[in-house]
Amino acid sequence: MAKWLRDYLSFGGRRPPPQPPTPDYTESDILRAYRAQKNLDFEDPYEDAESRLEPDPAGPGDSKNPGDAKYGSPKHRLIKVEAADMARAKALLGGPGEELEADTEYLDPFDAQPHPAPPDDGYMEPYDAQWVMSELPGRGVQLYDTPYEEQDPETADGPPSGQKPRQSRMPQEDERPADEYDQPWEWKKDHISRAFAVQFDSPEWERTPGSAKELRRPPPRSPQPAERVDPALPLEKQPWFHGPLNRADAESLLSLCKEGSYLVRLSETNPQDCSLSLRSSQGFLHLKFARTRENQVVLGQHSGPFPSVPELVLHYSSRPLPVQGAEHLALLYPVVTQTP
């Protein structure tokens, strides 16, 4: 009876039945830190703020948990600024007379500003030049620059009456002499052709024999004409034979003469033989005449045999000597003896 009264009248207080624990759906600090770092690592700095997803109410943006603010986004973020906005900002911040500096950043094609047209320097692309020539067939297009020519003050104001300034630079309208050096080859070609025509049509050309008109091979380089040598005179009576003359005296005589001068003297080692003393550009040459078994006279190893010394001298007075060191020389100027 007492138990029933206590339960019915609630004298001792009625306890509620035990309830299950309330689940905790909040994320742990470690999980929130991981997600915040992941968002920072894979964040697109150029993504518009409007297109970003709203943060989770229970995430780091929830104001109910002030301790979670340390996992928010960093303060220094990359923000995309349009080129037009950047130019307007520079114009507002800079002075009225200050020129806008060229944007040195890399821009997307749609952000690039149109550049001013480059100055005309006379150069034209082949395709453009072809298009201009096809579009303007009746108008002469000047593809090359003309040289600058100073004009007189009076001609710059206007040409005098009855005279027309020379603006054309064609060869047939050129007033300069025909032998000027700055003319190209094509301008002188006509003058050269006329000069050759006058030369070939002249009476002197008609009187020349036909064999001379033929194209001949140029003769080998030969020395200039030498003084005449008479091979009929014996060696002792030749004016260039000096008899017993030593080498020093021969060089003293040749030192006063020019290149190609020569004399014949008796040899110092063998008075029965003769020697040739020659003046060259490099000094003096002393060559000894030798005789073969047939009693022929030779000069060096490559010389042909001759009956006498005067004939050998006559032969090499018009031909180079076949001697090493004197291949370009000939016996041109004999040094005659001085009679008392």
From Swiss-Prot:
Tyrosine phosphorylated by ABL. It comes from the Eukaryota. Residues 1-77, 94-186, 198-230 are annotated as: Disordered. SUPFAM superfamilies: SH2 domain. Residues 98-108 have a biased composition (Acidic residues). Residues 240-335 form the SH2 domain. May function as an adapter protein. This is SH2 domain-containing adapter protein D. The gene is SHD.
